Amino acid sequence: MLYLREDFQKAWEGQNPQDVVETMDGEVYRALEARRTYRFELNGNGFFAKVHGGVGWMEILENLLHFRAPVLGARNEWEALERLHSLNIDTMTPVAYGETGSNPATQRSFLVTEELEGMITLEDFCKPWNKTPPPFLLKLAMVKKLATISKTIHNNGLNHRDYYLCHFMMPDVLSPDPDNLTFYMIDLHRAQLRTETPLRWRIKDLSGLYYSAMDVGITRKDLFRFIKIYTGLPLREALTQYESMWQAIEKKAQKLYQRMARKLPSNS
């Protein structure tokens, strides 16, 4: 499959798009054995390219042995972006996508998206909150926004698998109206799509989000607000009906927090 927006059709006319992205110079943000992410410019505009090489049979088998779906290339993220746009969830804008080869171990692919300019991650935005709490209405609006996004994607068969505050971006200049927030979901290369999101993957996403918010002054009331919106139920009913899920989320988030704390330098 190949998709090129009109400006990329003109820029890459007569060339093999996969070869173009594999040989293009840019500011490298991440370089792994089978995936490279870099920034480049075209016609004065910024873009990000994720270029995937073949992952190899060992990587595929390792994932299957652990009952995980292997990420073979850019298709995951391309399809996740399509799903998010259909749900009116703000995210990256794809401008070019291609996939070459039918062998899953050697398949090559790429995805190019528009740069999100003037943004800050929610993780960085919320870091000062533990010492300097935000305005109540802003925090309330952000909790509502995250709960609504989480409910929407999970109820429509999408789970992120790396669902942390750092994978949401927002404008670094806030709207004066707290209820007019815009969050952009990013880094969807491991996302999964189904007709329904299984419980285990809801737990993984929500425990990741909770873990990433533990050091920003999240209160019990904030959690309750999130739960009410996510379930669409009165609080008591939501806590009772999904008690085992909330317990699993709490346990998994605490375990992740403790594991990551052990990895930090002792003087952190």
Q: Could you say what each language-model-derived stretch is?
A:
Residues 155-165:
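Catalytic-loop of the protein kinase fold
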Residues 180-254, 258:
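C-lobe/activation-segment region of protein kinase-like
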Residues 102-107, 173-181:
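Short, solvent-exposed loop/turn segments that connect beta-strands within catalytic domains
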Residues 14-122, 151, 155-156, 245, ...:
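Conserved ATP-binding subdomain of kinase catalytic cores across diverse folds
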Residues 121-133:
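AlphaC helix of the protein kinase catalytic domain
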Residues 1-16, 40:
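N-terminal presequences and immediately downstream first alpha-helices
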Residues 163, 167-174:
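Hydrophobic residue at the +6 position relative to the catalytic HRD Asp in the kinase catalytic loop
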